[in-house]
Regions:
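Active-site loop of classical SDR/Rossmann-like NAD(P)-dependent oxidoreductases
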Residues: 35, 223, 247-267, 280
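Catalytic helix-loop patch of NAD(P)-dependent Rossmann-fold dehydrogenases
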Residues: 72-87, 107-149, 153-156
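Amphipathic terminal alpha-helices
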Residues: 271, 279-347
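Mid/C-terminal beta-alpha module of Rossmann-like enzyme folds, strongest
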Residues: 195-196, 202-255, 296-304, 308-309
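NAD(P)H-binding glycine-rich loop region in Rossmannoid oxidoreductase-like domains
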Residues: 40-82
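N-terminal Rossmann NAD(P)H-binding glycine-rich loop of SDR-like oxidoreductase domains
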Residues: 3-20
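Adenosine-cofactor binding site in Rossmann-like domains, unifying the SAM/SAH pocket
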Residues: 21, 27-45
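NAD(P)-dependent short-chain dehydrogenase/reductase
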Residues: 137-184, 189-198
Length: 347
């Protein structure tokens, strides 16, 4: 088995490379600044030279707000998320190489109350979501041997601005912060990389498992619940934040484009097909915060160590932070969402 990871500098790409480095799997990694996917001849040349048995595309443009308001950003979003996927799909078809492609829950409109299934109808409402959906659509048309893995919002130590901004805002505003009132299932990029690696191994065994799959961490949450979780964990490492947390007040903002109300996915199909189980996001949150605060990981305590057990019990007994939740109505009517160019059911 030999893999080509395209999108090496994305957070998912970084986590995938980290995992692959600890295996005996041969792989090469490229990013968009090393290979211009808008030049088909260069793509064919690069893929032919590397000669992989599978291509994993985790390249993405994911700045939702910028893609919605900046024409140049929107163009770049389309180039990477749609045109780039088309180019890679054509090369993979030409060279008979299976392609595993990372996509997003933002191909949906967020109006469903339950988690989204693979068979649910796509109806993206923002530029980013449309670019991901059009990329999926062309991949299905161009390459039969494909797997599309949709995930919800990813986080990692490699891209930790959300965590940093959240902590900084909480400190600067004496515990008063604002978040969008949406429901999602934040997933550590390392967990998503684990899933891709599990898929790769079964594809290498010639498993006929082509199609679309969903994965995200266990238990969808409202964003204010996730914020509280992050801040409570951060407070264990930050004395200043720990003092502020008892007065935490979270203001809930209305969901407006480019965001969607619900982006959580049902991951039962991937379990049934590949035997891949959902993991909790908790360890991932802890890992990111330890990276931010420069915590060095120590060896786990030996069983029977009474001091370690007492310390752990004290941590578990830490009282839950009580928050004030304030829902804010939109100041102006929400803009109507233009329909996607085409909606279809997935297989």
């Amino acid at each position: 088995m030999k893999l080509l990871v395209f999108g090496a500098n994305s957070q998912l790409g970084q986590e995938l490379i980290r995992l692959l480095t600890d295996t005996e799997i041969e792989f090469s990694a490229l990013d968009t600044d090393q290979l211009d996917v808008l030049k088909p001849k260069e793509v064919v040349k690069a893929v032919t030279r590397i000669n992989p048995t599978q291509l994993i595309n985790v390249s993405t443009y994911s700045n939702l707000q910028k893609a919605e308001t900046d024409p140049q950003a929107a163009k770049r979003c389309d180039q990477i998320n749609t045109d780039g996927v088309t180019a890679l799909a054509r090369v993979c078809k030409q060279l008979n190489i299976p392609i595993i492609h990372h996509s997003s829950s933002y191909v949906f409109d967020g109006q469903k109350k339950e988690t989204y299934d693979e068979e649910d109808e796509a109806n993206p409402v923002c530029s980013y979501g449309k670019s991901k959906w059009y990329g999926e659509r062309t991949l299905r048309e161009e390459s039969e041997k494909h797997i599309i893995l949709r995930t919800d919002w990813l986080f990692s130590a490699y891209r930790n601005k959300y965590f940093l901004n959240l902590i900084d805002s909480c400190k600067k505003n004496a515990g008063k912060i604002s978040v969008v009132d949406n429901r999602f299932s934040p997933t550590h990029a390392g967990d998503a990389a684990r899933v891709i690696l599990g898929i790769v191994k079964q594809v290498d065994c010639n498993a006929e498992v082509w199609g679309t799959y969903h994965y995200n961490a266990m238990q969808a949450v409202n964003q204010d619940q996730f914020v509280l979780h992050v801040l409570e964990e951060a407070a264990k490492l930050d004395a200043e934040l720990d003092k502020i947390l008892p007065s935490l007040e979270i203001e809930l903002l209305p969901v407006e484009r480019p965001y969607i109300r619900n982006s959580a996915l049902n991951a039962s199909k991937i379990m049934g097909t590949f035997g891949i189980k959902q993991h909790s996001r908790g360890p991932g949150v802890t890992a990111v915060l330890e990276e931010i605060y420069g915590v060095k990981k120590e060896k786990p305590p030996v069983q029977g160590n009474s001091a370690a057990i007492a310390s752990d019990n004290e941590s578990q007994a830490r009282p839950k932070t009580k928050t004030k939740r304030k829902k804010v109505s939109a100041k102006k009517p929400r803009q109507s969402m233009p329909p996607a160019k085409k909606a279809a059911k997935q297989k």
